[in-house]
């Protein structure tokens, strides 16, 4: 009974030692130089922008996972550092499956939202990745593949290592803030937690690079255009076997009021409230809220 698991079922879950696996993940990614002032303003302390302001985007197809989801995904990250360790601060991660959205959002704090359509399309040497949300194409990567990637192609994003079986892979670190609003609508449920989550990426066959274009666009709900493309470092396409490793809390926002300016991009509610704000209605709304809290 899923609503109330038996003791032996709970024990089985514990003994699975589950880590999300993405087999034959088809990924089109790009790393580019972005605006230094934007990176400095967006990245919350104690995370620090990298010396060269970099961003990474990707569009991916996940045809096989070990958690029952087949889905597509896009993402935007700003490169950052924490205590001299390089990582990626996630700003956007649209998906097209509700369970894929819930999992990483609730456990790690990824800013996942449901998209209208996410595609990766390859014809001969041309690859196009696209993310459409709220009827707007917010991310598009186009590439003409030309050659195999050099051995150091992941240096901006991760480090070379080996997994527990000795398989060569790349370790990519994501930094995220995990938080929930309080039930009463005032502040946070708990102090926002800074989470470190590592992913191992193993090449599955040939990984290619090429020339192309990256477009990040803004809508009222998805301001990806705030991280503009200044210069493309690389565009890469290939298939991977990825494993998301257990995350860990490495810090907290001890001043939640100061942190709060970074806490409103994970939902679409705030842009709507700001757009519909009416100063003349403020007094009556405050009176109603005061009464509502007594029910």
What is each stretch, according to the model?
Residues 1-50:
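Short, extreme N-terminal leader segments that mark the start of a protein/domain
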Residues 85:
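Short, positively charged
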Residues 91-102, 134:
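Short, solvent-exposed aromatic-acidic interface loops
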Residues 9-10, 106-295:
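Interaction-surface and assembly-scaffold signal
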Residues 25, 71-73, 124:
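A general secondary-structure signal for short beta-strands and their flanking turns/coil
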Residues 50-81:
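Short, structured protein-protein interaction patches enriched in aromatics and acidic/basic residues
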Residues 73-77, 90, 126-128:
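Broad gene-expression machinery/nucleic-acid interaction feature
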Residues 33-35, 60, 79-81, 94, ...:
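Structured loops at beta-to-helix junctions and adjacent beta-edge loops in soluble globular domains
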